[in-house]
Structure formats: C-alpha cells, structure tokens
C-alpha cells in the first residue's frame, strides 16, 4: 500500500506505491496517477497547507520548478517564536550560488622527467573541466558486488579493534556531546510539529528498507535532520525535502553503493526537482559545518552487544527498541546516544532474560542501573504503546523472519526498578 501524509498527521493510503502526491498540502486524500510500467516505490507526500499543484508522474521529463529551493528555510531569531508569528519575509542566512555554465581552467603542473638523459622539468597544461550544473556531484557505481554479503565470515575482533575498545568508547562518549541536537527544538518551530517529524521518520524507514540501506544510515540521517532543525526554521512544505537531503547525505557517507540522486527525487514523487534536492544538500552541509562523523545509538548498542555476548534474538530485540526512539523528539533527544543504547539493551535483556544491566557493561561504560533508569522507564512506556501508534514501519520491519519477529513479542507491563 502506498502511504501519504495529511497535515493533521494521519496516514492516507492509496492503491499503489507509485505516484503518491503531496498529501501534506491538502488534508483530503490526493489523486494518484499510476505509471503501470515502473517498479513500485515507496513515496511520501509533501507537508503543507497550500493547494497542491497538479503534477505529472511521467519519468520521461520532469517539468522545471520555479521554486528557488530554500525560500522556506529561515534562521531562528534570537527569541522564542510566538504561537502566531507575524508574517516575515524569509531571509536566508547564507548564500546559495547559482549554477554557472561549464568553465575550463588551465593548471600548470611541474613534472620531472624519469629519464637520466633529460633532467629538465616538463611543464604540462592539464585542462580541468569543472561542471557546475544540475548534474549529480558524484557518479555512483551500480555494478553488483563481487563478494557475497555474509556477516558470519567477518571477524568481530578485526572490526572492533578490541585492543583499543576502551579508547574508542571514550572517544565516542566525548564526541556525542559535541554533535547533539537541541532536545526541545520542536517548541521553537513555527510551522512543523513532532507528529509531522514522526511521519517523516516512518517514511524514511520505508525508504531504507526499499533500498536496503544500512541501519546506521538511518541513524545518521536523523542526526543530520535534528541538528538542522535545531537551528533552522523550516516550513512544512519543505520538511520532506530536508529529510530526503539528510538521507541522501547519510547514504553517501555510509553506503558503498548509495542510491543515485534521481532515485531520491523519484521516491518523493518528483515533488522536488533534482536541482532543489542538491541545493538543499548544499545548505544542509553548510549548516552542519560538514561535521558528518557522529556517534549514534546504533554504534553504542553494537559495542554493548559485542562486549557482553547475547543471543541473536536479543540483539534484534535491542535493535528494534533502539530504533523506536527515532520516532519521538521528546523525551529521547534529552538523553545522549550512549544512555539510550544502554536503556535499549536493559529492556531487551529484561524482556528475555529477566536481568537488566550486567556488571561487565557497568564497568565498561561507567553507567549504573540508576543512571539508566529514567531513560529505561521512558523507553518501556513507549514500547508498550508502539502497537497502537499510527506509524508502523519499524514494527513491520522487525515483524519479518529476518529479525525473528521480535516486534511481536509481548513487553513486560512493569519493570522492577525500585
């Protein structure tokens, strides 16, 4: 089923995955044009209150858009915005460079001769063609991998570098404090809500499953998104554009074979042009100051699971619980990733083994159970309500046999933390 979003946060469904229109623009279910000869894709409508524009879904040619790309992204003012802010003309806090024609530069490089007879320096003029156009800034090699993807043949010690595990953990603990989004940034957003962000995360999970992206890619994308929204005000009509640019950037960082830019344009039902997406990627990088290497909940959880070996089922259950924390800004953004990962480990361990936090991990992390208890309680309550959430992409993901159907396990109703 194709899923679309309305401005009130409800999920709208249609009969096809392809051609989802901008349901955020209209609370009613938007019309869908189906391209019968194309493979099915997961698409998401755009968040917005304005009248949605009629658009063609034809892949043959996308009509040019007149939107500048970032006109709905504003810098936060110095004070908290009121509930009904007065209309203010958008003022971008940075300069977006307009695409220029291809230019040719001549660079002189001094190359010494390799022969003994000719010791003179040879000057070569190398012409570099710098294509400053709308084309993708990178070329993706889509050839299949030659080696089979078998995690069982990977030596964990070779990957984790066990000799330096304490130094690595200490470095990640220090780095997580430097790249944290603001815990309550959503309260300062004038036009978007936590419910809209939740719907966006749900869609990004489906995108990750559609293109078989790594779990770490999703966590990185959410870090980029939350850090961007912590200091920039975004109108609902551009929220999906920022989210798409975030997962595009995370894919380039994490994946060996990331999807092409055109694929990300396609999954938005061509709501945004390729030029808009690349410009938003540029804006995202400037706001993040190119700080893309950040610790995530996933990284800490993998450390814990490797440090204190558990069953495969518990690994999947802990990963499921940790991924659920991506759905909500409050209360989980107020906890550092290492603490959230510890809470996911404790809850999964108690659900299956009736124990919380092993002594080995307490010594390794310095976290006592009393330190983890507040985050653990919040995560427990959220997991109890997960089956009744409108957004079910994460639960559906972990319902599969690949993850041993851990999302179907019944959570304990009470945790003996006192």
From Swiss-Prot:
Q: Indicate the principal place this protein occupies in or around the cell.
A: nucleus
Describe the family membership recorded for this protein in Swiss-Prot or TrEMBL.
Answer: Belongs to the cyclin family. Cyclin AB subfamily.
User: What PANTHER family does the database record attribute to this sequence?
Assistant: CYCLINS (PTHR10177)
Keywords, A to Z, come to: Cell cycle, Cell division, Cyclin, Mitosis, Nucleus
Please describe what this protein does.
May be involved in the control of the cell cycle at the G1/S (start) and G2/M (mitosis) transitions.
A GO BP annotation: G1/S transition of mitotic cell cycle
Q: Name one GO molecular function term.
A: cyclin-dependent protein serine/threonine kinase regulator activity
Q: Which GO terms describe its cellular component?
A: cyclin A2-CDK2 complex; cytoplasm; microtubule organizing center; nucleus
Cite the InterPro entries for this sequence: Cyclin (IPR039361), Cyclin-A_N (IPR032447), Cyclin-like_dom (IPR013763), Cyclin-like_sf (IPR036915), Cyclin_C-dom (IPR004367), Cyclin_N (IPR006671), Cyclins_cyclin-box (IPR048258)
- Please report the organism this UniProt entry assigns to the protein: Xenopus laevis
Q: How does it assemble?
A: Interacts with the CDK1 and the CDK2 protein kinases to form a serine/threonine kinase holoenzyme complex. The cyclin subunit imparts substrate specificity to the complex.
Q: Where, subcellularly, is it found?
A: Nucleus
SMART domains in the record: CYCLIN (SM00385), Cyclin_C (SM01332)
Q: Name one Pfam family in it.
A: Cyclin_N
Classification via Gene3D superfamilies = Cyclin-like
User: What's the name of the protein?
Assistant: Cyclin-A1
């Amino acid at each position: 089923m194709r899923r679309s979003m309305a401005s009130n946060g409800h999920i709208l469904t249609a009969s096809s995955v392809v051609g989802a229109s901008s349901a955020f623009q209209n609370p009613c279910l938007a019309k869908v044009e189906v391209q019968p000869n194309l493979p099915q894709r997961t698409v998401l409508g755009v968040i917005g209150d304005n009248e949605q524009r009629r658009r063609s879904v034809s892949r043959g040619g996308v009509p040019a858009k007149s939107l500048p790309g970032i006109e709905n992204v504003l810098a936060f003012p110095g004070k908290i915005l009121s509930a009904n802010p007065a209309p203010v003309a958008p003022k971008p806090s940075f300069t977006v460079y307009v695409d220029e024609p291809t230019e040719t530069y001549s660079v002189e490089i001094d190359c010494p001769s390799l022969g003994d007879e000719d010791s003179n320096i040879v000057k070569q003029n190398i012409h570099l063609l710098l294509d400053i156009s709308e084309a993708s800034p990178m070329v993706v090699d889509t050839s299949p991998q030659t080696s089979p993807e078998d995690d069982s043949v990977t030596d964990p010690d070779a990957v984790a570098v066990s000799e330096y595990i304490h130094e690595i953990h200490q470095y990640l603990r220090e780095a997580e404090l430097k790249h944290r989004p603001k815990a309550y940034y959503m309260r300062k957003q004038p036009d978007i809500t936590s419910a809209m962000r939740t719907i966006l995360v749900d869609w990004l999970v489906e995108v990750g499953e559609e293109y078989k992206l790594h779990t770490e890619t999703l966590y990185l994308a959410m870090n980029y998104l939350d850090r961007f929204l912590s200091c920039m005000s975004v109108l609902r009509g551009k929220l999906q554009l920022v989210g798409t640019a975030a997962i595009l950037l995370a894919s380039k960082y994490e994946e060996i074979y990331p999807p092409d830019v055109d694929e990300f344009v396609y999954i938005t039902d061509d709501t945004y042009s390729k030029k808009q997406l690349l410009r938003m990627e540029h804006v995202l990088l400037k706001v993040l100051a190119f700080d893309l290497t950040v610790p995530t909940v996933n990284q800490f959880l993998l450390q814990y699971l490797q440090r204190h070996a558990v069953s495969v089922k518990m690994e999947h259950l802990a990963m499921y619980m940790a991924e659920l924390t991506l759905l909500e800004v409050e209360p989980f953004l107020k906890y550092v990733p290492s603490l959230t990962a510890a809470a996911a480990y404790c809850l999964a361990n108690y659900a299956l083994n009736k124990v919380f936090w092993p002594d080995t991990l307490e010594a390794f992390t310095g976290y006592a159970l009393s330190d983890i208890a507040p985050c653990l309680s919040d995560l427990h309550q959220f997991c109890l309500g997960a089956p009744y959430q409108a957004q079910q992409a994460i639960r559906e993901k972990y319902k599969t046999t690949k993850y041993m159907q851990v999302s179907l396990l019944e959570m304990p109703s009470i945790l003996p933390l006192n």
